[in-house]
Amino acid sequence: MSINRESGKYPEKLAGAMENSTYVVSAWDGDKLVGLVRSLSDDETVAFIHYLLVDPEYQKCHIGDGLMSRIMKNFDNLLYVNIMPSEPKTIPFYERYGFKRYDNYSAMVLKKF
């Protein structure tokens, strides 16, 4: 699966990110990784879904829905679940899971590379 993000240039950091994530859910076709979602959470008030990735060859096969459904089960008792979609075209996908855009919330990023 290709990662169309800057973090894909740092495979050793990605491995560490998986190990240090609160929840990681993956989808496989045999021994091929075809989907992945990971999150960080304090398991009390808030979780951040860092990204949801699906191999382009497997998109439109409901893999993203399966990954979201599985990871969201971990957040039933939290006050907030945050996500920062990297592509505007994915916003309707997240809206199906109850995510909304609010005028008084803005995401900010500090790039250190």
Question: Residue spans of the language-model regions?
Answer:
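Short amphipathic alpha-helix that is part of the acyltransferase structural core
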Residues: M1-K9, Y105
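Conserved active-site alpha-helix within GNAT-family acetyltransferase domains
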Residues: N77, V81-K112
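Residue-level recognition of the GNAT/N-acetyltransferase active site
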Residues: D55
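A conserved beta-strand-loop-helix scaffold within acyl/acetyltransferase catalytic domains
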Residues: K13-L52
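Conserved acetyl-CoA pyrophosphate-binding loop and the N-cap/start of the following alpha-helix
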Residues: Y58, H62-L67
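Structural motif corresponding to alpha-helix initiation and N-cap regions
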Residues: G8-E12, D65
